[in-house]
Amino acid sequence: MISLHSSAIKASLYGSFPSSLRSTLSVSFSAGSLIRLPSVGKRNLSVVVSSGRDSSMSSNNVSRGSSSKVAAESFFRSVLGQMETVYLNRNPTPKSVLELVRSVDDQQLCYDHLAFRTFGIGGYGIDSLASFFLDYGYTPMDELKFPAKKLRALWFAPPNASAVPGGSGVNGPLPRVFISELLVDQMSSQTQDVIRKYTEASPNGKKYAGLSSALGTLTWEKPLSSEFEQLARESEYAAWTLVNGYALNHVTISVHRLKSHLNKIKKLNQFLEEKGIKLNSEGGVLKVSPDGGLQQSSTVADSISFKFADGVTKSIPCSYIEFAERLVLPQYQNIPESEIQESHRRDGFEVGNADKIFESTFQEQLSRRTG
């Protein structure tokens, strides 16, 4: 098992970024230390403006502040890019879907949101990943509750940031972020014991949530196959998180931002199914919010071979790709289509939709791949 406290790993990640960014980072490679990243938040970019002989100093400070912000955003996108790379390398279906969509719509492809799963215990829950996004200017928005699945989630709105010219995916408009957590204290004592066994054995792992996702490694040791099966019997979400950790659970294509005829989710669903892509059928392929403004669908998750600590190798669920169309709000229906902005469309998430999309990694849906 690779340790995220390894100085070699930190050095490798640090060296993977452009030299223009490395100078902005304060990095310590001693065991157990954190990589300190430049912040986008206003609190770390404030400049004191003075007059007279200090004017040149103020000008230099402004220049440095602007440069730091650009470097920070570039670094942030690079980390998202590493998360995306791990995700696409492990999951052939999302990679195929992106290629299929681009074969028809080769212009800018935007992500609506990125999603992650966590264990809500001992600091390993939503906050462990949220801190990475909050440091870069994201804003916490609404809480969603899923009592039947014993889950809760928070979504985060992105800061205003300039997309890379012509950039797609993580280099396009910054996506929303959706982070969920298992309410561990509501699970059976047996399930709680398994989860605590791994999270408590790695008490500092929660500090490296973003790094774990970017490197594609767990922050705890590989579990026993019997423990995975035990969790799966009570919560398939719990079992998924035990073996996938902070891996990107899914990315979501912003359907209405596509430029071709695929910019309507029903047409996109039909196109993908005709190409042999299996879509999550739980609650119907198309999930629609009560107000009709948020329409979503998703593929069935891919499976990968996983070798457990006891030497047993099994197929486990991995990740999937989602699609979201956000309709124009009623009060903006009279605005010309060419003038419609994202702020004119339905924002946020819907519990009923998300509840069914969670099941993209569940066995009932996975079995449809071979059905």
Swiss-Prot record:
It is found in: Plastid, Chloroplast. Its cofactor is Fe(2+). Disruption phenotype: Delayed germination, compromised development, cholortic phenotype with impaired growth, due to lysine accumulation. The keyword Cell membrane does not apply. Its main location: plastid. Catalyzes the decarboxylation and hydroxylation of 2-oxoadipate (2OA) to form D-2-hydroxyglutarate (D-2-HGA). Is involved in a D-lysine catabolic pathway. This is 2-oxoadipate dioxygenase/decarboxylase, chloroplastic.
